Structure formats: C-alpha cells, structure tokens
Amino acid sequence: MGKNRKSKRQLIRDEKRAKKRGHENAEEEVRDAKRQRRTDGDEEHNADFIPLDGGNGDIPGFVIDTVGDKRRAHKYEGGEVEAEINGHGGDGGGGGGPGSFEREFFGMLAEEEQEYFRHADELLELNDFPSEEEKTIFLANVYKEAKGKELKLASSQSCSRLMERLILLSNTKQKKSMFDAFSGHFISLVTHRFASHCCEKLFLQSAPVVTQELAGEVPEEVPVEGQEEEELTENQKMSMEDLFLLTLDEFEEHLSFLLSDRYGSHALRVLLLVLAGRPLNQAGVKSLLQGKSKEYVTVEGAAANASELISQTRTVPSSFTAAIQKIIVDSTANLDGAALRVLAKHPTGNPTLQLLLDLELSMAPKGKKKAKKGEEEERQEEPVKETLLEKLVPGAPASFAEETSPACEFVNSMVYDPIGSRLLETLITHCPGKVFKGLHAHIFGPRIQSFLRNDIASYPAIKVLNRLSKEDLADAVEKSLPEFGALLEKGRLNVVRTYFERCHVRNATAQLDQLLQALTKACNNNWKHIVPKLCPLEEENEEDKSKEKKFQPAEVKNKTALLSHGCQIVSTLLSIPGNPAKAMQTSLLALPADKILRMATLNAHTAGIVTKALSTPPQLPHFHKLFVAAMLPNIIDMALTHHGNPIVCSIITMASKGDKDVPVVPFHLKENVMAKLEQRESQLRESWLGRNVWRSWKGDLWSNRRHDWVRWAKETNPEELRLAAAAGGAKTLEKQEEALKKRTEALQEEAFPEEMEEDQPEESEPVKVKKEKKEKKEKKEKKEKKEKKEKKEKKEKKEKKEKKEKKEKKEKKEKKEKKEKKPKVEEDAMEIDG
C-alpha cells in the first residue's frame, strides 16, 4: 500500500509530462478556435474569445492547511485519467468527453462596446459617483446597453467581471432576466473559462430569492425615473424555484461529464449547495467552490440582506431535495466501482464526489420508522437503486472483514493517496454508525498507530479518532503512547492536539494524564520546556524579513505550519482544567520577557496563546499577575504591533479582585502599565495602534482626573466587591471632606477672628442653593433614619407581644389538658378496683 508509491523524482517527471500535454492541448484548442472564426467569416483577431480549458489554472477545491498537505495537493493532471473517467460516461450522460455536446460560440463585442463596458467596470469597481441617484441612473443605462449582449459579455475575458458585478447589484427581476438570457445555453456557459464564473455568481445570488419567495417576503422594486417598463417574458414570470429546475433540466444529459470538467464541476457544486440550502460563504465551503487563484469579484452597494441569507442555512422547497437525489443517481448511474475509484483520485472530480457523498449521507433517513402498508407496497414494487456509498464500499460493514473484498481494497487504496484520502475523510465523518464500527474494527483500529505516523493517512485516522467512544479512544491512546515522541519529531502535531481534545471531550482523565506525561517526557521531563518545544520562537534574519511571503521556500512554509499547529496544542491544553493547564501556565511563566514579546507580536497563532492564557482561570497562584508583570518592560512595543495591540487593550478589562477561579490583575499593576504608557504618550499618539491603546486605557482621564480614572478602572471588579468598596469609599471621602472643612474654618478663625465675625462675605446664590439642598438632604436622611428606627422598635415590640401571647396560650392549653387527664385517671382506677 504505502510502499508502492512513486518516488519524488518520478512524481516530478510525471507532473512535467502532464503540463507539457496540457500546453499541447491548449495550443490545439487555439488553432481550432481560429479555424472556427475563419469559417464563421470573422477574420479580425480579438482577445475576448479564449478557448475552453485554456491557461494554467490551479487545482480547485483543495486548501493546503497542514504540514503534510503539500504532498496531498500534488497535481495529477494528464490525459490518461481524463480518458479513463470520461470513458465510463455512457451514451446519455455526456461522458464521451468535451465532444459529447456542441459548444456554442456567442460572437464578440465591437471595439466601441468593449471600451464602454470596460469603462463601466472601472467606475463600478472604484465606486466613483457623486451621489446614489447618479449611480442608479448609470446602472440603468449599463443594463440597457447590456440587454441582448449578456452571452457575449459573460464569455468575454475583459468584460466578464462587469457581468459579475451587475449580477451582484441586480434585483430579483433583473436576476430572472439573466436566467432568461442564459436559458438554453447553460451547458456551454458553465464549461467556459470566464462565463462559468458568471453562472456561479448568478446561482449564489439567486439562492436567497428562493427562500424569500417561499416565505412571501420578496422586497418591492423601486422603478428608476425615466426608465421604460418592459414586457415580462414567460421565464421572468416564473418563480426562482422553477428557473433553477429548468437549469437542472439542461444539466441532466451532461452530469457525468460535468463531474470532472475543469470549469463545469465548480458550477455543479454551487448548484448542489444552493439546492441543499446550506450556507454558501463558510471557509470550508469556499475551498470547495473555488480554486486558490480564482479572483473574487466584489462591488460596493450589493444587497446586505442577500449576504446575510447566504451565510445562513436556508429553507428550500421539497422539489430541490428530490432534484439532489436525482442528480446523485443520474451522475453516478453509469459509473462502476473502477470508474468511481479513478474519479476519487482525480483532482477535479474528487471534490464533486465528496459533495455528492456528503449530501447523500446527510439526506438519508435517520432511525427506523414504521411505514404504512401502502408505502411498503410501493417500495416493494419500485426497483432498489444502489446508493453511492454502496457503490464505493459494497457489502459494508460485513465486507470490511475480508481483506480481498472490493470495500476493503477501496479503503486501502484511498488511505495513502494524496487526493483519494479526502473522499475517505468525508466517508468516515458522515457514514452511518454500523459502517463506521466495521471500518474501525477491521481496518483502522488494529493499525491506528501506523496510520497516525503517515503524513497522508493521518488525516483519515484523525477523523476516526473524532468518532471513537471513550473505551475505543483509550485503546488508541494505549497503542500510540510508545510512539508519542516520534509523532512530535515527525511534526504530527495535529494528531497530538486531537488526542488531547477528544480525551477531554470524552472525560478520559486517566488518558489525559498519560498523554501529558508522554509530552513532558518528550520535552526533557520538564514542564518549562513544553511551550518552547511546541512553539519555537526563533529570531528572523534581516534577509528573511526583506523577502516577500509569496516567494517563501517550502522549508519556511513548513516551519510556519508547524508553529501554527504547536500553538493550537498549547491553546487546547490551556482550555483543559487541571494538570494540562497548570503545565502550560508553568511553561509560560518560565519564558523570558523577550520571548513573551515575540510570542505576542509574531503572528495571530502565537498571539492567540497569550490571549488564551489571560482569559483562562489560574491553576497557579497569582499566575495572571506574574504573567502581566513579565510583559511590563515591553508593553510599549506590544502596543505598537498589530497582534500585540489587542492583548494590551484586554489587560485593563480584567478584574482587579475576585475569586480563585477568576483571572485577576492587581490594580497597582494596572497603574504601573498606565504609567509606562504615559511616559511614551507622544509616541503612542503618532500611530493608529497607539491611539487605540491610549483610548482603551482612557489615558486622557488618567492625565487630567486621576480619581475618575481610578473609579473607572475598578469597574471591572465583580459587582459585590465593587459595591462594598464604593460604600466604604464614600463614607471615607465624606469624613475626609468634613475634617478638612473644620480644619480650614479653625485656621481662618485663628488668623482673622475679627474679619470672620464682622466682614463675612455673603454667599453667592449657587452656593446657597447647594447648601440648602445639602441641609434638606441631611434632614431628610435623619428623618428617614428616625422613622426606620421607630418602625424597627414597633416591630420588635409587636414581636415580643406576640411571643408573650403565644406563650400564655400554650400554658393555658397545657393546664387544660392536665385537668382533663385527672378525671380520666380516677375513673380508670375505680374500674380496676371494682
């Protein structure tokens, strides 16, 4: 399995050959396009028409997010794979390759039209309009000029961006007009290098309209002054749901071909996500929908409501669910196990297959529900269709027990493949519990430690760890403990992080202690060395700083990825109470001041550790006090950096007093930080970051009204402590003011006794008013105190009286009972005598 892989030299040679074949194919396409132009009678050369599959694009749908992903994102381009996949397309599925349908050429724009639309695109990009009214009128004119030229604009290299911006700014009526213009030509558009982006944008922006129409919340469109109302076509009168279904009808015959088409596969993925009602702008979804080098076209003034709906899970009609099921069945109907295996290793087909499998498994009914008799009869009459999961792993979970079964061979062939392993990750994450148990019991469970060592197989193995029970997880930890040091040396830090996270989630405390012990052993048996080991904070050379990030060598990128994963482990351990957090806090306090400065300012990942440490409960006495004190010498340098700035701002928001479980920074330490900031006030005011820190710490209040700053800074304390301190502080302040006033009056009387008696100046009106108010307030307070005292005394008297009455009643009752008992005793005695 892993030993039969090609060497690095062979892979590079294959890649060069594939690129050469790609260039040759591109040149042939250019020649064919030129011949086509000559036959159409159009002899002038124009850069607007670019042949399909031209240029050197990237591999869509993949993101290098880990250390081992460099090998996983290897480019498997070549005619052999394409031919093998397209050879299984069938007659009606468009599987015969690009020639299975006739590509349309929509013509080219005239030079004047090109110039006009390019200028319009520049204006919209710059948003350089004096007012909104002028922008609205300008847009109306652009729409008017583009009427009837939508297909030419979409397939033009220089004007397709304008079409995308127009779609972003379109209202519901205009979007339906776009669907009407593209109708009947969608298959040619989605397989075109530039027009495919316009189709994707149209699908994405029209998705919220379906939800709005279902809820009856379609906003009314304000007509533009001077614009003539046009007659609506049949397509424009339809609902957005029907327009999407009509588009699917055009795709139906070519689904197998679109699975692996360089541009069409992206449009198919977008359409599937729209039909499923899933969020369309999440990080994971973006990597699935577009390649790394794809330009993201935006424009100011696009509808904010639509973007909110795109970011949420949307309500979709039942017809969309049925359409997804039909797409899954039709696209894979003519693909057998061998073809699916080839498609799973194809760089363009794999992401589409991932999405189809994900949708199928998420839409599958969960739990056993009793069906009615009529439904059971209908199901028996209908032929049972084989699902995509059954095609990939036939006979699962029972077939996993046999090493020679197709299901077992499929998993073993995918687990070490840089592209196929991604499909295996999707299968492991979403497959039913029975299938997962069989997969773990027969394939991953016995060899989990060897899978976790490998840079490619570790990713499916991590997905397995995420689904394990507490007992199975403990077994996996026991198998991996002897090789824990090797995992750290090989850079499998994501495996280490997953182990700690899952043990914490499953409450496996014994395994957590074992993992921490193994980590400590790998770091010279000392907690102080853990953070430096996981996050090597080496100083950069001046030459390295001068180089641009785009041209970083592979080794530098690898170090950055390792640092990122190391920071994630430290953050994870800080969030686990007990010994893990205690070990990290011990290691952080052992760092010198310059290392803490570098950690706080290097990048977002290292700064995240400092932020996490300041927000987690202390496991060591006075941890936050000592940690902030270590930052104090370099607090200005931290304040003036992008990543350190939020850390300095967060210190003032921390409590000055509190319980043991609350992060506390003593007030005197905050005063020391503020004093440091005041010394470099002029330097802080020179930059935006410095001004932000000065505002957050209320530096002007510190300079002008220190008492108010102290009161404000202590507002971060817990409410009970703050109220108690405020009450005590107010009394102390009143006493101090009274003592000062008496002392001043006594000194004045001693110095000028006659003047004080004879020539005492009259008080001004405001002073008199204040004095009267104060006297009234004091009288009122005295009166209230007196009333409270009287009420209290009355209440006490009443309670005493009630107690006395109760006591008397009790005594009377007891006497009465004694009297009643005496005659009874005498009667009993007489009866006994008789």
UniProtKB/Swiss-Prot annotation:
GO annotation (BP), single: endonucleolytic cleavage in 5'-ETS of tricistronic rRNA transcript (SSU-rRNA, 5.8S rRNA, LSU-rRNA)
Bias kind Basic and acidic residues: ranges: 38-47
Comp. bias regions, Acidic residues: 749-764
Positions of Pumilio repeats: 145-180, 181-216, 250-290, 630-666
Cited Pfam families: PUF_NOP9
Record family assignment: Belongs to the NOP9 family.
Native source organism of the sequence: Podospora anserina (strain S / ATCC MYA-4624 / DSM 980 / FGSC 10383) (Pleurage anserina)
Name assigned to this protein: Nucleolar protein 9
Subcellular location per the Swiss-Prot or TrEMBL entry: Nucleus, Nucleolus
Positions of the UniProt region annotated as Disordered: 1-54, 749-834
PANTHER family: NUCLEOLAR PROTEIN 9
Keywords: Nucleus, Repeat, Ribosome biogenesis, rRNA processing
Molecular function (Gene Ontology), one example: RNA binding
Entry keyword annotation includes Repeat: yes
Biased composition (Basic residues): 1-10, 770-822
Function per UniProt: RNA-binding nucleolar protein required for pre-rRNA processing. Involved in production of 18S rRNA and assembly of small ribosomal subunit.
Keyword rRNA processing listed: yes
